[in-house]
């Protein structure tokens, strides 16, 4: 395990690759043509900004950014304060309520406090056109996030990967289960949560794993920045 490496160290070469340059150029061209793209440009890489490589303890894989106004801000499943909590995240809160004594469902869906504790909230595609789900799925983001997962697999040890749904599980096939702790369940979407996401106990199992390794468990109660100061 390499503890001092940063995202910049391991991704600098990847960001020079022609496919990645093309991805950024395509997104920029769409923005300049008047298309509304989510999240805003300044937020596209927030998952990496809030959770440095050497601090990654848990990875939660999402798929596409939210494509409604004001929702996406670069962290999978999370929405900005003041935005209604989306259905999948409500189901994550429901699972937390059912498995963690004392967990009280917050009135917001802002998960930055998870990210600061080492939970990488990574969408596998980092941008989307407003109102058009999966509209940027073929731009090259999947190649980039495959690389991110392989780098975590290589440079970290004992990371908990929470793989919810077929897309995340396929994406996580490269993870070495001897080096990391892989937990799988159906997606928390209302379409599939009742097929085994509810009752999966992943948040509790994650903390048990971290404590067994002598690491600080995650405080899964999301707090807004002003609440934690």
UniProtKB/Swiss-Prot annotation:
It catalyses: Hydrolyzes single-stranded DNA or mismatched double-stranded DNA and polynucleotides, releasing free uracil. Pfam families: UDG. Keywords: Cytoplasm, DNA damage, DNA repair, Hydrolase. PROSITE patterns: U_DNA_GLYCOSYLASE. One of its GO terms (biological process) is base-excision repair, AP site formation via deaminated base removal. The active site is at 64 (proton acceptor). It is found in: Cytoplasm. Its main location: cytoplasm. The keyword Hydrolase applies. One of its GO terms (molecular function) is uracil DNA N-glycosylase activity. Its EC number is 3.2.2.27. One of its GO terms (cellular component) is cytoplasm. It comes from the Bacteria. Gene3D superfamilies: Uracil-DNA glycosylase-like domain (3.40.470.10). It is an enzyme of class 3 (hydrolase). InterPro entries: UDG_fam1 (IPR002043), Ura-DNA_Glyclase_AS (IPR018085), Uracil-DNA_glycosylase-like (IPR005122), Uracil-DNA_glycosylase-like_sf (IPR036895). Excises uracil residues from the DNA which can arise as a result of misincorporation of dUMP residues by DNA polymerase or due to deamination of cytosine. Belongs to the uracil-DNA glycosylase (UDG) superfamily. UNG family. This is Uracil-DNA glycosylase. It comes from Enterobacter sp. (strain 638).
């Amino acid at each position: 395990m390499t503890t001092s490496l940063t995202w910049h160290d391991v991704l600098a070469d990847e960001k020079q690759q022609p496919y990645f340059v093309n991805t950024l150029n395509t997104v920029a061209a769409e923005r300049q043509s008047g298309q509304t793209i989510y999240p805003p440009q300044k937020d596209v890489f927030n998952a990496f900004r809030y959770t440095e490589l050497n601090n990654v303890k848990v990875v939660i894989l999402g798929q596409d950014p939210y494509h409604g106004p004001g929702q996406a801000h670069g962290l999978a499943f999370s929405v900005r304060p003041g935005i209604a909590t989306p259905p999948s995240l409500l189901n994550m809160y429901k699972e937390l309520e059912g498995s963690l004594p004392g967990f009280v469902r917050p009135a917001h869906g802002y998960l930055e406090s998870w990210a600061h504790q080492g939970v990488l909230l990574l969408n596998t595609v980092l941008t989307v056109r407003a109102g058009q789900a999966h509209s940027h799925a073929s731009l090259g983001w999947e190649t980039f996030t495959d690389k991110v997962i392989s780098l975590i697999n290589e440079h970290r040890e004992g990371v908990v990967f929470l793989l919810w749904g077929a897309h995340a599980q396929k994406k996580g096939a490269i993870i070495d289960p001897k080096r990391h702790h892989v937990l799988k369940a159906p997606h928390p979407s209302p379409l599939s949560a009742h097929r085994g996401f509810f009752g999966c106990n992943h948040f509790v199992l994650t903390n048990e794993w971290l404590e067994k390794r002598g690491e600080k468990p995650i405080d899964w109660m999301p707090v807004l920045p002003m609440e934690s100061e």
